[in-house]
Design a protein with these regions (language model features):
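Membrane-embedded segments
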Residues: 58, 65, 69-149
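Histidine-centered active-site loop/cap adjacent to the catalytic His
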Residues: 288-319
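Hydrophobic membrane-insertion alpha-helices, especially the h-region
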Residues: 9-30
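Substrate-gating cap/lid alpha-helix
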Residues: 241-274
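Secreted/periplasmic serine-hydrolase-like ester/acetyl group-modifying domain
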Residues: 120, 129-231, 319
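N-terminal Lys/Arg-rich, disordered targeting/topogenic segments
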Residues: 1-9
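Active-site segments of SGNH/GDSL-like serine hydrolases
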Residues: 222-249
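Alpha-helical transmembrane signal-anchor/signal-peptide segments
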Residues: 31-51
Length: 319
């Protein structure tokens, strides 16, 4: 048996296979919507790819950040049509906690950004950083640098990436991955598949009194932005009022939560908008307990634009 010849042939096939797989990963990342996998969340990876491509093309004065409360409940076009923002980019992704919002912003060039809008709900302040697999590699990618290590790691994850990408990309559900030009995913009510469980869901909330430690990641985010001369705007999104009133303990917590944020905003000098109280939406604006349809997203964003215009006017008056 010609072992040397066999090993040489085997080695050649192995090198050829790895090279072909490597080129496939590179090609998919460059020429399709399939993202490189930097995180445990394929939806986050899709947003990371989108964000890098957008940031390479132009600069933005306003970033939208957060979980699906920002991804689905903000209509960036409304902001751009107002006088408060010219170029808006939505960097949000499903399930991003406040800690992960700060982590991502630390990897992004903020030199042209004047305002960051954090659209949130009470459950976004809980949770630590856990989605990013290799923070150093992701930071290199966001700077436009070559990430050879990640390309090779993605060869092994290619079957899983294909499966997860096509599993999650379902129009008319909360899992839809196709962003508009700003990075939003606004839900069109017609044809939307309303999930009965999510319509009646009250996510877990703390049963102990709130203090600053509950908002430590928000405070760290605010400090990070203030150091760079960037305004932070925090929004509490609407929640189905019927659900709030159905649980006395939750109702008490929800109002305590919004009151605490209001007080905190005055001390820490960020803009706070309690959109739940100000809009007082009925069920016709919701697709589940706390996600809005496209009309609800437009109205919420118009409220934000109007409030920021008032803030800008009051500051001019103070000069």
């Amino acid at each position: 048996v010609d072992y040397a010849g066999w090993l040489k042939a085997w080695f050649g096939y192995a090198v050829g296979f790895v090279a072909a797989a490597f080129l496939l990963v590179v090609g998919l990342e460059h020429y399709t919507d399939m993202p490189l996998r930097f995180t445990k969340s394929v939806s986050y990876d899709v947003k990371i790819k989108f964000a890098r491509e957008q940031l390479e093309e132009k600069s933005f004065d306003t970033f939208i950040v957060g979980s699906s409360m920002a991804l689905n409940n903000i209509d960036s076009a409304v902001l751009e049509s107002s006088h408060v923002s010219q170029h808006v980019l939505n960097l949000s992704s499903w399930g991003l906690a406040a800690s992960e919002v700060l982590q991502f912003l630390q990897m992004v060039d903020l030199s042209d950004v004047r305002r960051v809008i954090y659209s949130s709900q009470y459950f976004d302040y809980q949770g630590e950083v856990d989605k990013v697999l290799d923070e150093r590699e992701l930071a290199r990618y966001m700077k436009g640098q070559w990430v050879l290590k990640t390309y090779f790691q993605n060869i092994a994850r290619l079957p899983e990436s294909f499966m997860r990408y096509f599993e999650e990309d379902h129009q008319g559900t909360q899992r839809y991955l196709k962003f508009d030009e700003h990075g939003d995913v606004n839900f069109v009510r017609e044809g939307f598949k309303i999930n009965k469980h999510k319509w009646e869901e009250i996510p877990p909330f703390p049963k102990t009194p709130l203090d600053d430690s509950y908002f430590k990641h928000l405070l760290a985010l605010n400090d990070y932005l203030k150091d760079r001369g960037i305004e932070l705007v925090v929004i509490t999104n609407p929640f189905r009022q019927e659900l709030i009133e159905s649980d006395e303990e939750f109702q008490s917590f929800f109002h305590t939560h919004t009151d605490y944020l209001k007080r905190l905003s005055k001390v820490q000098r960020f803009v706070y908008i309690n959109a739940h109280a100000e809009l007082n939406f009925d069920d016709t604006y919701f697709v589940d307990a706390y996600h809005l349809d496209e009309t609800g997203a437009q109205r919420l964003t118009q409220l934000v634009a109007d409030r920021l215009e008032l803030v800008r006017f009051s500051r001019v008056q103070d000069l």
